[in-house]
Amino acid sequence: MKKEMLAMILAGGQGSRLGVFTKRIAKPAVSFGGKYRIIDFVLSNCSNSGIDTVGVLTQYRPLILNSHIGMGSHWDLDRINGGVYVLQPFMNEKEGNWYNGTAHAIYQNMDFVDTYNPEYVLILSGDHIYKMDYSKMLKFHKEKGSKATIAVIEVPWDEASRFGIMNTNEDSSIYEFEEKPSEPKSNLASMGVYIFDWKMLRNYFKEAEKNPEINYDDFGKNLIPKMLEDNVGMYAYPFKGYWRDVGTIQSLWDANMDIIKSPETLDLADPKWKIYTNTMAMPPQYIGKNANVHRSMIADGCRILGEVGNSVLSHGVVVGKGSKVIDSVIMPNVVIGENVTIEKAMIGECATINDNVQIKNVNNEINVVSEYENIEPRCVLIEGGL
């Protein structure tokens, strides 16, 4: 069945800068905000934008991510005509390779896209936190007569050299793309959100297929510069909302803190734009008689007998008597014993922090504890990780 636009979510990245949190799972499957996994945001954006056909391109350690997505029913994507499809690298009669880059991942799945013969294809990163109506971006794409539209967001000038920067004319047309420029001319950073006319993009892939010397493996490094060289009509779509690339431990911690310290920046309670997830069947949270909880997100299944402040606790977390959890992100099913102090830390899934452990914030560095780690009683962790 022909679709006007389908979405392809790039979700195969390892996320090596997240260190211990991606040892066993893909970056888009990392827990966020007490209740969610990172990929929930783009899946919810697709559903809320009226996009009913979504391909999720996985590669690195996909088991938990695949299980989380399932049939897509939690995002209303279990459709007869459309739905969500998990697409992994595969072999055919000629070749079989891992995805070599963002564009190569789409190229390998041309047959899937052709099944729906869309006018447009929406390319998304599965590891960013934001809420966006893609139908508005598509409207912009049509109004401009664009062949390729890239969503951009203004970043602080002193941070612009960390991003792929789009240099634009007054009409928002893009005349130059610079990857992490040392002296940026603009502060419009690419969000990794693209709309392409499918026939045009497909023609580029077919050109590379015929000529082994042509490399279109990556959108930012290869394909977008080539399109600009060919004077393809390319426009920058300005996005004004909250957006964060949670590619590092610091940025992941910052984004979690944003939802408790400035909840208006990323309103998770907005009834008009809900963020859906594959929820766990767990009892309500329990707050003990002598517990003290302030400015925190506490998920279902938590049992709080101590103090929790300025923190995000995922489902199934236990905080024992006399324990304090301050300025921290605690991932699912962590058990914290009695008389424990945890300050400015990120604790991985299913870790056990035994009685009288001290995890202290000394130099304002984030303390990190690996998933499934067992911290022995009376250990002291200062400015570091396990």
Swiss-Prot record:
The organism's superkingdom is given as Bacteria
The annotated subunit structure for this chain is: Homotetramer.
Q: GO annotations under biological process?
A: glycogen biosynthetic process
Gene encoding it?
Answer: glgC
EC annotation from Swiss-Prot or TrEMBL: 2.7.7.27
Q: Which NCBIfam families match?
A: glgC, PRK05293.1
Q: Locate the residues binding alpha-D-glucose 1-phosphate.
A: Y99, G164, E179, K180, S190
Signal peptide as annotated in the record: none
Record function comment: Involved in the biosynthesis of ADP-glucose, a building block required for the elongation reactions to produce glycogen. Catalyzes the reaction between ATP and alpha-D-glucose 1-phosphate (G1P) to produce pyrophosphate and ADP-Glc.
Against PANTHER family, the record matches this protein to:
GLUCOSE-1-PHOSPHATE ADENYLYLTRANSFERASE, GLUCOSE-1-PHOSPHATE ADENYLYLTRANSFERASE-RELATED
Q: Please write the reaction equations for the catalytic activity of this protein.
A: alpha-D-glucose 1-phosphate + ATP + H(+) = ADP-alpha-D-glucose + diphosphate
The terms under GO molecular function for this entry are: ATP binding; glucose-1-phosphate adenylyltransferase activity
Task: Identify the enzyme class.
Answer: transferase
| Metabolic or biological pathway | Glycan biosynthesis; glycogen biosynthesis
Keyword field = ATP-binding, Carbohydrate metabolism, Glycogen biosynthesis, Glycogen metabolism, Nucleotide-binding, Nucleotidyltransferase, Transferase
Which InterPro entries is this protein grouped with?
Answer: ADP-Glc_PPase (IPR011831), ADP_Glu_pyroP_CS (IPR005836), GlgC_bac (IPR023049), GlmU/GlgC-like_hexapep (IPR056818), NTP_transferase_dom (IPR005835), Nucleotide-diphossugar_trans (IPR029044), Trimer_LpxA-like_sf (IPR011004)
What is the recorded name of this protein?
Answer: Glucose-1-phosphate adenylyltransferase
